[in-house]
Amino acid sequence: MARIAGVNIPDNKHTVISLTYIYGVGRTTAQKICAETGVNPAAKIKDLSDEQIEQLRGEVAKFTTEGDLRREINMKIKRLMDLGCYRGLRHRRGLPVRGQRTKTNARTRKGPRKPIRK
């Protein structure tokens, strides 16, 4: 298994699919990385040379991925909560942030139902 950005990339999958195992790299970004490095997106990782894998590592390093991206997202959410703005309050209360209805639905964000006490 090749290791790129601290993630073990599966050998038996196509390059584009394998790159999506990295947090912060989706299909579009993976295709851009393959185009920049000149690596065939349909080639499997096990068929790539060490030089090509190094090129992929260098190209992935240009993007914010894995722990840095998670930290950045958490810091942005924390900033909203500290500001006390509407979005921050919704994050703090564990409710949907983007204007979805909550009278019904929103169970994923709100958690399991709580029984009504009498």
UniProtKB/Swiss-Prot annotation:
Located at the top of the head of the 30S subunit, it contacts several helices of the 16S rRNA. In the 70S ribosome it contacts the 23S rRNA (bridge B1a) and protein L5 of the 50S subunit (bridge B1b), connecting the 2 subunits; these bridges are implicated in subunit movement. Contacts the tRNAs in the A and P-sites. One of its GO terms (molecular function) is tRNA binding. InterPro entries: Rbsml_uS13_C, Ribosomal_uS13, Ribosomal_uS13-like_H2TH, Ribosomal_uS13_bac-type, Ribosomal_uS13_CS. Gene3D superfamilies: 1.10.8.50, 30s ribosomal protein s13, domain 2. This is Small ribosomal subunit protein uS13. Residues 93-118 are annotated as: Disordered. It holds the Pfam family Ribosomal_S13. GO terms for cellular component: cytosol; small ribosomal subunit. Keywords: Ribonucleoprotein, Ribosomal protein, RNA-binding, rRNA-binding, tRNA-binding. GO terms for biological process: translation. Belongs to the universal ribosomal protein uS13 family. Part of the 30S ribosomal subunit. Forms a loose heterodimer with protein S19. Forms two bridges to the 50S subunit in the 70S ribosome. NCBIfam families: uS13_bact.
